Amino acid sequence: VQGKGNVEIELDGDNELKSGFNRAGLEKTDFTFIGTPSTGMLTLKDDNQKAGSLKATGGQFGAGIGGAENGNGKDITIKGGTVTATGGEFAAGIGGGFGGSGENITINGGTVTADGNDWAAGIGGGKEREGENITITGGTVNAAGGIGGGTGGNGKNITITGGTVTAKGGV
């Protein structure tokens, strides 16, 4: 997902995205250092008329949902459905790829499982990068690798006001 527009994806039925080398499973990357930053919002939702799920797996160095290698995964909202996001090597489940931060991530519904891989956050930054402005207001969230920055990166402005959240740090 690139460009300046907003993208809203309605989850109906079971969906699976698996990426190749250096890419995210569902990519919403901001490469500010090599071109125009992406300014749109990616929203995943399920209107509950048809049960919806998404399983997104990043390729080597790519987030499950968010940034490719060296890409920031930002401006991502999950409003519902069952979402499972697994990062590739050194990448977040939801947020930054290896070398990328995770910013402005909101979860306000659904069941979300986010697995960071090898020193990355479950939700937030890839290895050695920050995770910031992460908000959880509802739903059930399980984050392996924790919530915030990857190993060597800072986590800041993490707000949890509702839902059921389990966050476990990892290596």
What annotation goes with each model-predicted range?
Residues V1-V171:
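A composition-driven surface/loop motif
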